Each structure stands twice: as C-alpha cells, then as structure tokens.
C-alpha cells in the first residue's frame, strides 16, 4: 500500500517591519550608475534598513515622494567653508541643495593644525560631513612667511612635517593655489616633495593652477606631473579658460584630461556652472608687481606711476 502525503498550503503574509521614516513612491537614483526605479526607502535610527519596490514597512513618519527623485546626498568637493562653520553650523545653503558632504581647504588655503580644526568641527555638531585638504600656501607661510624665494632645506623639512602631521590628523590630501601669494613663488619640485608626503597617506592632490588663461596647457601638464611624480590622484579645481582670447581652447584642454585618463592616470576636474568667478586682487596684477613679496608689492603700488602702468596692463 502506497503512502500518500498531502501538503496543505496556506497563504500568509509577512508582518510589516517598523521604521522611523518611510519614503514612498520616489524615483530612486542610488548612485551606482544604475537607471532610476520607483521604490520605497525605510529608515531606522538614522540608517537605511530597507530599499526597493516591495519592501514591507510601517513608519512613525511617512513621506510621499511621488514625482520626486530620491538620491544619496551630493558631495561638493570645492567649498572654502573656513570661517563660516561657526556662523552657520546648520549649513542650510548646502542641505537645501542636497549636499551632505563637503571638501574644504581648497586652493592652498586651510587650517594648519588639523587636529584642532576637526575638534572644533565636532563641537559644532554640523549638519554636513566635512573633509579638509591641507593647504600649501598656509603651510609655506608657517614655515617661511611670504618670502619670494626657494625654501631652505630646513624650511622644506618643516613644511613636510606639517603636511605629514595634517595627514595623520585626518586631512584627505594636499591643495595648492599656485596663482596666489606665496604659492606663486614656489617651484614645481617643492610641491612634488610635499605631495609625496601626502601620497604616503593615500591623499589626493587638488590644484588651483598657476594660470587658467594663456598658459593653461602647460599648467595642466604641471598639475599632472606633480601627480605622476608623487603617485597620487589629481583633481584640477574649477577647470576653465580665463580671458576672451582663450575662449574655445577647451577643444585642447578637455582632450588633455581625456587622454591622460585613457592612459590610466587618475585625474579629474571640477567646474562651477556659471560664467563668473571670485578671487583676490593679486591674481590680476602682473608678475613684475608681485615680485619680492608683499612689502615690495605695497611699496610699488604706492607709486602713482606704477599704478598707471598696472591699469594699462
């Protein structure tokens, strides 16, 4: 006699899990490069605990995202927030634009003591995440003031020590502002030596180049040379062409970046989406005015005949 087994199948549903926040019906862009899709996102204790089309959650707060895009927070890699942290710890200007993480210390300007800087940030309970580069200009000022000369070996070692300590304390790389005083007085090899220190701690090299106008191609090459010599990724800041005489040269500069990347070199660029810029007055002065440091600059500009020549330039 054969035994017959009868299985009774009963329909059942899984109980919905509890979350603090449930974002429903949004177009989800997850940041991986995949196409968007409709779905829900469940958040518990500040962390995503469910994401997808058919997740089962109830929540204390439900947000209807119909017709809206839901995405991870954006990273702004060029911000110059130094000095604003205490005035606006809520960082509304970033949050309202969907930016949740920023990089500061760009263009060679940063706090030199990173341990103190990060401790200050922690005490403010900022609403955004902050990473900082260590700025070459401030490192150089600390070691040798605004002198228009090469550093002595002792000064060079002091700069290297400052960069190393900054990287140990959490800096994410080295930035330069080679158009600004005193960075404009430095030679390429000086920057290479400091970049090698940051590279040992897996940092990135971010460059505000010496010039973004007539000599832009050679300055792009300098930025990439520094990266290659130090074996670190390069980020070229606010990639652009200054001066009407240079309009259209992006047909040359953009392929330079593409070619380097195709060859396996890690170089990236950032760009602001408008046709204005903000910088210091010194960048508009000719090299012969900037020679020999700030005291000499002030003395020259105090002379009426010099000011007339500068206006003509």
Regions found by a protein language model. Name each.
Residues 80, 107, 135-137, 177-181, ...:
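Active-site beta-loop-alpha junctions enriched in small/polar residues
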Residues 1-18:
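Bacterial Sec-dependent N-terminal signal peptides
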Residues 65-70, 74-81, 86-176, 195-202, ...:
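Divalent-metal coordination cores built from histidine and acidic residues
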Residues 19-21, 28-73:
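Histidine-rich, glycine-flanked metal-binding segment
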Residues 224, 232-236:
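Cationic-aromatic interfacial patches
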Residues 117-121, 138-151, 178, 228-230, ...:
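Polyanionic/metal-chelating signatures
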Residues 165, 171-223:
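Divalent metal-binding pocket/active-site signature
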Residues 80-86, 110-111, 183-186, 211-217, ...:
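Acidic-and-aromatic substrate-binding clefts and catalytic sites of carbohydrate-active enzymes
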């Amino acid at each position: 006699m054969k035994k017959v087994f009868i299985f009774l199948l009963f329909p059942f549903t899984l109980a919905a899990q509890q979350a603090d926040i449930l974002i429903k019906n949004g177009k989800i862009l997850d940041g991986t490069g995949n196409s968007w899709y409709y779905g829900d996102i469940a958040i518990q204790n500040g962390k995503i605990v469910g994401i997808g089309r058919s997740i089962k959650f109830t929540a204390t707060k439900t947000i209807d995202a119909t017709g809206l895009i839901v995405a991870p927070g954006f990273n702004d890699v060029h911000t110059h927030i130094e000095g604003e942290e205490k005035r606006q710890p809520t960082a509304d200007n970033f949050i309202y634009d969907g930016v949740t993480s920023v990089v500061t210390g760009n263009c060679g300007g940063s706090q030199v003591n990173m341990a103190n800087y990060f401790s200050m940030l922690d005490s403010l309970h900022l609403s955004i995440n902050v990473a900082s580069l260590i700025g070459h200009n401030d490192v150089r000022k600390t070691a040798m003031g605004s002198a228009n000369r090469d550093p002595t070996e002792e000064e060079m070692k002091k700069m290297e020590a400052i960069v190393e300590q900054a990287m140990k304390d959490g800096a994410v790389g080295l930035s330069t502002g080679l158009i600004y005083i005193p960075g404009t007085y430095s030679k390429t090899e000086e920057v290479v030596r400091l970049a090698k220190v940051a590279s040992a701690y897996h940092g990135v090299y971010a460059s505000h180049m010496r010039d973004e106008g007539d000599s832009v191609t050679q300055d792009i090459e300098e930025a990439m040379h520094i990266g290659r010599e130090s074996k670190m990724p390069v980020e070229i800041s606010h990639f652009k062409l200054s001066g009407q005489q240079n309009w259209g040269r992006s047909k040359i500069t953009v392929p330079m970046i593409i070619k380097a990347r195709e060859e396996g070199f890690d170089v990236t660029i950032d760009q602001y989406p408008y046709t204005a810029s903000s910088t210091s007055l010194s960048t508009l002065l000719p090299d012969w005015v900037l020679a020999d440091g700030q005291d000499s600059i002030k003395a020259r500009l105090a002379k009426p005949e010099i000011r007339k020549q500068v206006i003509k330039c």
